[in-house]
Regions:
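Phosphate- and other anionic-substrate recognition elements at nucleic-acid/protein interfaces
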Residues: 1-171
Length: 171
């Protein structure tokens, strides 16, 4: 089963497919930006025959000035996946952090450090945190599907219990 992890962002959307990561960066604004990011995600999903996607959920505690625009992006991407019959699961940011580090309040630097220590992968560049988050989301999905190649602690696996997994194939 081909899987994808998505850390949605208006400036640098992190994408993980089979453990390989990249980011989507566009120079446009407004609705045109939403369309470009959506199209890039869907084209990549179709090209790689993606069968299920893990998306990071909204951060309700965030005070970002662009939270409404990020919400629009989340809705646009979810609708596009639905229209292409690609099932997805939404993973809360605190569950992603807890899975990566054992602590639900861990920030991006802690997540990157913890994942690097476990895997040897170095998350460099300005988009490293976004790519790392997408990788973690995909790993959570792979664990749930019984396909992860890594050993995870009980504390990390407990993060899976806070995710609504219904609707996924073979779960």
């Amino acid at each position: 089963m081909n899987t994808m992890g998505l850390d949605l962002s208006l400036t640098s959307t992190g994408v993980s497919i089979g453990g390989s990561t990249h980011s989507i960066r566009v120079d446009t604004r407004g609705v045109e930006r939403l369309k470009e990011i959506r199209d890039s995600i869907i084209n990549t999903a179709v090209e790689h025959h993606i069968e299920v996607v893990a998306i990071e959920g909204y951060s309700y505690a965030s005070r970002m000035s662009q939270s409404h625009s990020l919400g629009e992006l989340g809705g646009v991407v979810r609708l596009a996946l639905f229209e292409h019959s690609i099932p997805f699961v939404v993973i809360p940011p605190t569950s992603r952090a807890k899975f990566a580090t054992g602590k639900g309040n861990a920030g991006k630097p802690e997540v990157m450090s913890s994942v690097s220590a476990k895997t040897g992968i170095i998350w460099s560049g300005g988009d490293g945190g976004d790519r790392c988050d997408a990788w973690v989301l995909e790993q959570m999905l792979l664990v749930k599907l019984g396909r992860s190649h890594y050993d995870w602690s009980k504390e990390q696996l407990d993060a899976l219990n806070k995710v609504e997994w219904t609707g996924l194939p073979n779960v």
